[in-house]
Amino acid sequence: MTDILNDLIKNVSENIPGYIALSVTEIESGETLVSDSVKADFDIDLASAYNLEVVNAKLKTISVLGLNEEVKDITITLTDQIHIINIAPNGGYFIYLAIDSAKANIAITKTLLNKYKADLNNAI
């Protein structure tokens, strides 16, 4: 499992333009399984903890509304960054990815992220 997580960080950080940070967090426990940031002032672990609240709020909203839907991802566009919260098909974890909006293409980023997370989806 550790190898799969490390491969995910390596592939994403080396191949997604504008990469800032990435983490993988279990939804039920809130435990961050792996995290990486290329910016010293970007606290990815703290961001992951708060993004867990975003995920739980959205899941609760869907439940309260009685929607028979699954959340695939949540995209948050900031002034200079794009944050993507990609939820696993089994709902057990989410990948949080932060990218520089001036350097990244969101469609390419999401396509590559889906490609690189395939092994993780199979392992968890």
Map each language-model feature to its residues.
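Non-catalytic interaction/Regulatory regions outside core domains
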Residues: 1-124
